[in-house]
Each structure stands twice: as structure tokens, then as C-alpha cells.
Amino acid sequence: RDCQEKWEYCIVPILGFVYCCPGLICGPFVCV
């Protein structure tokens, strides 16, 4: 899903956890 909070974690299996901003999708991975 899209990020809803300012610093919400996205899961990227290769890089581990990364931050993303509200309303953004982390590359091919979505926020959890």
C-alpha cells in the first residue's frame, strides 16, 4: 500500500528496510 505516515518502513528484500515518504511507493515494493 501507499505510505501514510511521514517515515513509514518499506520492505525491500535485497536492501532490508528503507524509508519512504507519504503517498510514495518504494520501487516495485509497497509500504507495509
From Swiss-Prot:
One of its GO terms (molecular function) is toxin activity. This is MuO-conotoxin MfVIA. Expressed by the venom duct. The presence of a 'disulfide through disulfide knot' structurally defines this protein as a knottin. Changing E5A: 2-fold increase in potency to inhibit human Nav1.8/SCN10A sodium channels, and small decrease in interaction with lipid membrane. It is found in: Secreted. Changing Y19A: 12-fold decrease in potency to inhibit human Nav1.8/SCN10A sodium channels, and no change in interaction with lipid membrane. SUPFAM superfamilies: omega toxin-like. Its main location: secreted. Changing Y19F: 1.3-fold decrease in potency to inhibit human Nav1.8/SCN10A sodium channels. Signal peptide: none annotated. It comes from Conus magnificus (Magnificent cone). Disulfide bonds join C3-C21, C10-C26, C20-C31. On Nav1.8/SCN10A, the mutant (E5K,E8K)MfVIA causes a small left shift in the voltage dependence of activation and the voltage dependence of inactivation. In addition, it inserts more deeply into the membranes than the wild-type toxin. In vivo, the mutant (E5K,E8K)MfVIA is analgesic in a formalin-induced mouse pain model. Coiled coil: none annotated. MuO-conotoxins are gating-modifier toxins that inhibit sodium current by trapping the domain II voltage sensor in the closed position to prevent opening of the sodium channel. This toxin shows high activity on Nav1.4/SCN4A (IC(50)=81 nM) and Nav1.8/SCN10A (IC(50)=96-529 nM). It also shows low activity on other sodium channels (Nav1.5/SCN5A, IC(50)=431-3900 nM > Nav1.1/SCN1A, IC(50)=3.3 uM; Nav1.2/SCN2A, IC(50)=5.1-6.3 uM; Nav1.3/SCN3A, IC(50)=2.2 uM; Nav1.6/SCN8A, IC(50)=1.2-4.6 uM; Nav1.7/SCN9A, IC(50)=2.3-5.5 uM). One of its GO terms (cellular component) is extracellular region. Keywords: Disulfide bond, Ion channel impairing toxin, Knottin, Neurotoxin, Secreted, Toxin, Voltage-gated sodium channel impairing toxin. Changing Y19W: 2-fold decrease in potency to inhibit human Nav1.8/SCN10A sodium channels, and no change in interaction with lipid membrane.
